[in-house]
């Protein structure tokens, strides 16, 4: 079998392919992702990542064979779909914004506050940003949503499985 390597691809071809990818996947990836670098470093890994990203089925996951032979695919998907740009492109504003997803996934216009503190919003944003956090909420403070929103957002952007382990009875009674 023939293998595509960065050595066999010209700079001009990488730029053309990068422009094509950005135009074809504009609603599926960050507009400011460094496609030329990814194409130069791992053209096959990028191709597999784009194949998965291009599906509308959020339950599609990376096949084991691909992960075995191209382990960088998961990192490429993360770089394209889950690394929020500083300029705020259309994709990032839609897919990585907790307020937009709160409305889209749960139908709520705003996060709940407790004594004027936006606990849900702060904890959800920290989780989406990949920060380690400990959130202590009062009863009825919205812990369930704080677990679920980031997990659902991750699943949609990364095409992965998220497991939320929670002893909360409200999750077991109301949402399962």
Map each language-model feature to its residues.
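N-terminal accessory nucleic-acid engagement/regulatory domains that precede
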Residues: 1-93
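A short alpha-helix capping/helix-coil boundary motif
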Residues: 78-82, 99-103, 113, 153-157
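Conserved P-loop/Walker A NTP-binding site and adjacent catalytic elements of P-loop NTPases
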Residues: 118-176
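Conserved pre-motif I regulatory segment
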Residues: 91-136
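Short glycine-/small-residue-rich flexible loop motifs, especially phosphate/cofactor-binding loops
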Residues: 57, 100, 176
């Amino acid at each position: 079998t023939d293998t595509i390597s960065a050595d066999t691809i010209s700079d001009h071809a990488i730029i053309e392919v990068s422009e094509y990818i950005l135009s074809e996947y504009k609603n599926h990836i960050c507009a400011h992702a460094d496609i030329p670098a990814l194409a130069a470093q791992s053209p096959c890994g990028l191709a597999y990542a784009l194949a998965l990203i291009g599906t509308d089925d959020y339950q599609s996951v990376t096949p084991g064979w691909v992960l075995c032979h191209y382990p960088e695919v998961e990192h490429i998907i993360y770089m394209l779909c889950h690394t929020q740009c500083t300029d705020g492109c259309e994709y990032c504003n839609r897919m990585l914004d907790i307020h937009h997803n709160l409305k889209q996934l749960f139908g709520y216009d705003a996060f709940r506050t407790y004594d004027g503190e936006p606990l849900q919003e702060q904890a959800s944003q920290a989780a989406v940003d990949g920060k380690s956090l400990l959130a202590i909420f009062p009863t009825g403070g919205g812990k369930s949503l704080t677990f679920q929103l980031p997990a659902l957002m991750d699943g949609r952007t990364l095409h992965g499985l998220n497991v939320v382990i929670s002893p909360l009875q409200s999750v077991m009674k109301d949402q399962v």
